[in-house]
Structure formats: structure tokens, C-alpha cells
From Swiss-Prot:
PROSITE patterns: RECF_1 (PS00617)
Name of the molecule in the record: DNA replication and repair protein RecF
Compartments it resides in: Cytoplasm
InterPro entries hit by this protein: DNA-binding_RecF, DNA-binding_RecF_CS, P-loop_NTPase, Rad50/SbcC_AAA, RecF_2
Binding annotation for ATP: 30-37
Gene Ontology molecular function, alphabetical: ATP binding; ATP hydrolysis activity; single-stranded DNA binding
Domain of life: Bacteria
Organism: Chlorobium phaeovibrioides (strain DSM 265 / 1930)
Predominant place of localization: cytoplasm
Family to which the UniProt record says this protein belongs: Belongs to the RecF family.
Length: 371
């Protein structure tokens, strides 16, 4: 997959801007505040309908603008073109068109344009709370497994409905509980599907992480553990068994869940643990080691997607080299040479041999790219 062109209107600090990257490695170079990250974020929006920077759609509007518009043309490795038009207004929200046709729900677009991103704030995937790791895992599996995305959306809907019933029972202790058993059974089946998809993905993904991280870290051995609310899951388990274990846990926790008005077990509370040489990275690794682990995860995703779905992802790397030493920078660049189209933002021209350089210069209303 490659991006042939993208146009920005009123997207962050790009009032009117067109960008045409080349194949291979592209360096987007400019001063801080010139809009380098915004270019990557706009591409990410077109690929996955959201930015990799944690922000609401409205925060991406240029100052005083009432809308933003992104139009992009992608080309697959087999030569098939996909035209993406994504717009947002304060009044009607976000709209997506693919090849001129409006697409709903947006989830139908996920996986069509495989995309890997890296940005410094994503260090929380390694160092932050469990929700950040679950989000990373879900985003990764959704791009490579359409069934998983469908199962995840079903699970979230069932969880919301079961929680609503638990809140009703909490507020009315004498209310009939017969419906709770039905919701528990439905949620247990859905939780089993989501959990099985996650564990299956990790079993396939881990060898890619192991190989890359050992190279980038100087020989450290990575491992990934999936700690479910029904116990540690170190290898794939039949869905039927997972369903029974979830249902049993719901029944065991029923009284406490009613008191608290929420579901206390399930994929929404599971934990993903990253370890390096057997020690939890979140607790025992330095910030530099955590960053290296994150880069290993992201580059491993590229290799996994390339093999799993048969399409080369686009790599969007925001300021990836800022805290890496020369040895690790060289190692990452060696890997990126084989990663298809890669876009790197940087305020530094050093350590980017062989890159197509796009220098961002600013005017009051426009951002221009010059090679």
C-alpha cells in the first residue's frame, strides 16, 4: 500500500496544503510547529478514520474554521486505487466517502488501508495503565481480522446493556434478576470470542516481536503475557472453554456486580504485560528501554500485517529517533529500508541517508512541501 497524494483543508495548522510522498522513506522536515505531525495524523485519519494523536475530531479544526476536509488517493501493491474523502463539521460530525460513495459504519473501512504509526506520547502503551495496552491490542487485531472487529463491537454493546441492567438492580434491590442470567450468557459468549481473538493474535505476533526486539535491544528477550480476569492465558484456548469460565466468573461476582452496578470481569478489564528478560517493562525498564520496546512492537506489526494480510502497510513515524542512540537509530533505519512507504517527521536532518526530504515552510494561510 502506498499513498499517492493527500490534500488538507482546515486541518489543524494546514489551511490549504497538498502533499505527494515518494516510495520508500520520506523525511518530513521542518521547525517545531510547522505541521509535520499533522501531515501524519491526516494520513492516519484517511486510513483508520481517526488520528493517532489523542484528540477529538473538533480539536483538529484550524483556528476559527467550521470544517476540515481530507482527500487522499491510495494504491495497493496490486495497483488498485482507493480514493478517500473524510470530512468533519461541527454540525454534522464526521463523514467518510470511499471512491465517491458514503460509507457507514466507519468500521467497514478498517483494514482496507493497513497503517502503522508511532508517536512519542504512545510510550504509555508500555509505561501507562492497562487500558492503553488493550487499545493497542484491539487496534492491531482489528486491522488484521475483520471478524474480531465485529466481535469487539458486539461485546461493547452487550457490556453496555448488561451494565445498564446491573445499575437498575443496584437501585432497585427487589427487582427480578431473571434477565441478568440471559445477559450474562450472551456476554460470556461474546467475551470468549474477543478473548480468543486476542490470544490467537498474540501467539502469531510474538515471534515477530522477539526477533526485532533482540536486534534493537542488544539481545534482550521480550515476552508478552495475556492476563485475563479468568486467569493467565499463555496459549490459545477453545472458545467453549472460555465461555464457561466467563459465565462462572459472572455468577461468582453477581452480588458484587449488582452492588457496584458494573461488570467486573471480561476483556474490558484484562491486562497485557510486556516483559524484557522476564522483568515487567512498565516497572523495571528505563524510559529508553520502554521506547525501544514500543518501536519493536510497531515494527513487528508491519512485518506481521505484511505476512498476514498480504499488503504492505504504510508506516507513519513521528519523531521516532529523538531519544535513540546512534546504534539503535542505524538499526531502525536498516529495518525501515525494507518497509515499503515510510513517512518520518523530524526537526533534525541528521541520520536520514537515502530519504526523500520534504521541507515544510510556512505562510500565514498555507503549508508547502518542497523536496
Amino acid at each position: 500500500m502506498r499513498l499517492r497524494s493527500i490534500q488538507f483543508e482546515n486541518f489543524r495548522n494546514h489551511r490549504s496544503f497538498s502533499f505527494e510522498p515518494e516510495d520508500g522513506i520520506n523525511l518530513i522536515y521542518g521547525q517545531n510547529g510547522s505541521g509535520k505531525t499533522s501531515i501524519l495524523e491526516g494520513i492516519h485519519y484517511c486510513a483508520l478514520t481517526k488520528g493517532f494523536v489523542s484528540a477529538a475530531d473538533g480539536e483538529c479544526l484550524s483556528f476559527s474554521a467550521g470544517y476540515f476536509l481530507l482527500t487522499a488517493l491510495f494504491e495497493s501493491s496490486s495497483g488498485i486505487e482507493t480514493a478517500v474523502r473524510l470530512s468533519y463539521t461541527k454540525e454534522s460530525g464526521k463523514k467518510l466517502q470511499i471512491d465517491g460513495n458514503e460509507l457507514k459504519p466507519f468500521s467497514l473501512h478498517i483494514g482496507s488501508i493497513p497503517c502503522i504509526s508511532f508517536s512519542p506520547p504512545e510510550i504509555v502503551i508500555v509505561s501507562g495503565p492497562p487500558g492503553e495496552r488493550r487499545r493497542f491490542l484491539d487496534n492491531a487485531v482489528c486491522q488484521s481480522d475483520r471478524r474480531y472487529l465485529d466481535n469487539l463491537l458486539i461485546y461493547r454493546r452487550l457490556l453496555q446493556q448488561r451494565n445498564a441492567l446491573l445499575q437498575q438492580l443496584s437501585q432497585s434491590p427487589g427487582k427480578d434478576r431473571s434477565m441478568l442470567q440471559l445477559w450474562s450468557e450472551n456476554l460470556a459468549s461474546s467475551a470468549a470470542s474477543v478473548t480468543a481473538g486476542r490470544v490467537r493474535f498474540l501467539a502469531e505476533f510474538h515471534p515477530f516481536v522477539e526477533l526485532l526486539h533482540r536486534d534493537l535491544s542488544g539481545g534482550q528477550m521480550p515476552s508478552i503475557e495475556y492476563r485475563s480476569t479468568i486467569g493467565r492465558l499463555l496459549e490459545p484456548v477453545p472458545e467453549s472453554e472460555l465461555r464457561e469460565r466467563f459465565l462462572q466468573r459472572f455468577q461468582e461476582n453477581e452480588q458484587q456486580e449488582i452492588l457496584r452496578g458494573q461488570t467486573l470481569s471480561g476483556p474490558h478489564r484484562d491486562e497485557l504485560i510486556f516483559l524484557s528478560d522476564g522483568r515487567e517493562s512498565k516497572r523495571y525498564s528505563s524510559q529508553g528501554q520502554q521506547r525501544t520496546f514500543l518501536i519493536s512492537l510497531k515494527l513487528a506489526l508491519f512485518q506481521y500485517f505484511n505476512e498476514k494480510i498480504g499488503e504492505t502497510p504504510i508506516c507513519l513515524l513521528d519523531d521516532i529517533f529523538s531519544e535513540l542512540d546512534g546504534k539503535r537509530t542505524a538499526a531502525v533505519l536498516d529495518i525501515l529500508e525494507g518497509c515499503g512507504q515510510t513517512l518520518i517527521s523530524s526537526a533534525d536532518l541528521k541520520n536520514h541517508p537515502g530519504s526523500a526530504v520534504h521541507h515544510l515552510q510556512t505562510t500565514p494561510s498555507t503549508r508547502n512541501s518542497e523536496v
